[in-house]
Each structure stands twice: as C-alpha cells, then as structure tokens.
C-alpha cells in the first residue's frame, strides 16, 4: 500500500510522527527563491529530527528522498533560473520533471478534488497537458516506490497504474 501524508513543514508532533512512519520522502518545492531558501532550512531541520528520532530508538531508513519542483512556470522571470539552481543543488534527488503551474490544478483544488477527479475547466488541450505533466511526475514517483518493493515489476508502465488509480 502507498499512503501519502502531507504534514505542514513545521516539525511538531505530526511532522515527527510522519517522519518516523515514512519509508520515503517526496518534498515539493515551488520554483521561487523564498521557497527554495525555506526548503534548505527545512532539510536542515529534517536532519536534526532524524538524529533525535534515532537517539530515542526510532531508526530512520528512507528508501528514497526526492525533491519535486512544483507550481513551475518556465515563462515567469526567475523561475527558469530557480529550476536550474534546484537542478544544481539537489542533483540526483530532484525529479527530472517539474509540476507545471496550471489553472486546472487550482480549479480542482478549489473544488476539493484532484485533477484526476475533475472535468476540464478550460480547453480540453489545457486539461490534457496538465494530466500528461502530472502523469509524468507521478510516474517518476511510482518508479521510486516500486524500487522499494522487490515483488513489483518495475517495467510496468507508470501511466497505466496512475490511470487505474484515478479511475
């Protein structure tokens, strides 16, 4: 089973419990300077908290830690530069595909739905472009998860699985 927990970045009891229970971390970082700097601080806090957990008898062994650039608009001034900086900083920890900013995602969120549960709010091509982008990102995440499960075939197409989950 895959359970996704999305605690706030503050490291209170909820955040510590999520860190103790997790077998993998996916850290979203918008391609903006303040978010980038906040994430660096957050990573330092994660390292400190892992040390505290291990000192208190809770071993922490993440199968993967990945960073995903989120809400990315390549045409916005500075965001393309932040994407390049993230690639240099996070290197192999950064997913190769960023989550592109999209009105489709905003509209789905306002309706308390995922994009996979929503009908297109704009042109079908815009909706499909958003879905294709998310399928590519989630395919990378699924690959990371499958690599932790020796019983699962890594060769299975991620988009097939994402599509079946959405259905």
Language model: regions and residue ranges:
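C-terminal lobe/tail of nucleotide-utilizing enzymes
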Residues: 56-167
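Conserved catalytic-core segment of NTP-binding enzymes
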Residues: 2-94
